[in-house]
């Protein structure tokens, strides 16, 4: 699975106060065979993130920016809530003509650096989203007591919804959480049965596995994710599963060529899309997407 990096396709629009830096966690929605909308999280000068988007048109083997949001589609939540200091996109799906945005709510901590918990918003037009609930959709429990339950990806299969998400296993110190990918199911997108099953487990030399993206094709599940051995040096990995619960990691199947300097230390938060017979992966480069959104094309 060899990808050729195209480079940065969209940068933060610093003329907007809410989008001074970063385009984090690119989350792609296919509009038609040529057009996609990529949601992303951008930070203001106070380092607080909101969610915006860019529309890209694909033709003649090139992406062209045709529109981008001049204001956020989702802002941070109420003071004191789980998402009061920042929101990031994670997954968008459509149900009964309504678009549902699964997002990451961020707030700083005291004994630990931060909490990251998943929320849910909805929209009819994709230009603004309203929270379905003011509380998180993933809950703390005895097997998941830490406040990192986040970055979900969701697909529908067998008349129910499957979710894979990031779940914290421990904090080594105030600044160093360890987390992997777990699995949940739902019938209505709001109430989730958190199974506690670790799908993509940490290897001995790893600290984190993050931002899963899952598709189902040819009778098995495929997942792209990022994993970290050294702090701030995420790499993109890949796994396969027959049932969505037990996964085989095949990280060595992923290869990138034509690397750019601004992605030489990190590739994180992958999201894959197929357009007109071509396959692309969108992701962030060094420093968690500070410079913008990267794209790479799968070579046949």
Name each model feature, range by range.
Residues 1-21, 25, 29-85, 93-147, ...:
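Beta-rich carbohydrate-recognition and catalytic domains
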Residues 268-270:
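C-terminal structured domain segments
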């Amino acid at each position: 699975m060899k990808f050729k990096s195209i480079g940065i396709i969209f940068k933060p629009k610093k003329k907007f106060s809410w989008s001074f830096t970063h385009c984090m966690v690119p989350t792609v929605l296919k509009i038609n065979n040529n057009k996609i909308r990529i949601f992303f999280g951008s930070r203001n000068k106070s380092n607080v993130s909101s969610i915006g988007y860019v529309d890209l048109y694909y033709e003649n083997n090139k992406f062209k920016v045709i529109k981008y949001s001049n204001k956020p589609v989702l802002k941070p939540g109420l003071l004191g809530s789980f998402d009061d200091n920042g929101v990031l996109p994670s997954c968008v799906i459509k149900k009964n003509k309504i678009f549902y945005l699964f997002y990451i709510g961020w707030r700083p901590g005291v004994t630990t650096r931060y909490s990251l918990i998943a929320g849910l918003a909805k929209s009819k037009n994709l230009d603004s989203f309203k929270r379905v609930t003011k509380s998180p959709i993933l809950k703390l429990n005895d097997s998941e007591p830490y406040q990192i339950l986040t970055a979900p990806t969701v697909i529908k299969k067998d008349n129910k919804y499957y979710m894979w998400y990031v779940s914290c296993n421990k904090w080594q110190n105030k600044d160093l959480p360890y987390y992997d990918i777990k699995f949940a199911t739902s019938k209505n997108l709001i109430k989730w049965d958190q199974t506690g099953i670790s799908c993509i487990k940490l290897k001995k030399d790893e600290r984190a596995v993050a931002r899963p993206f899952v598709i189902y094709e040819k009778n098995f599940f495929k997942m792209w994710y990022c994993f970290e051995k050294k702090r701030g040096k995420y790499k993109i990995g890949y796994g396969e599963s027959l049932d969505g619960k037990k996964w085989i990691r095949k990280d060595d199947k992923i290869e990138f060529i034509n690397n750019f300097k601004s992605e030489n230390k990190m590739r994180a938060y992958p999201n894959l899309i197929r357009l007109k017979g071509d396959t692309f992966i969108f992701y962030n480069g060094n420093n968690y997407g500070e410079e913008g959104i990267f794209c790479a094309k799968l070579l046949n």
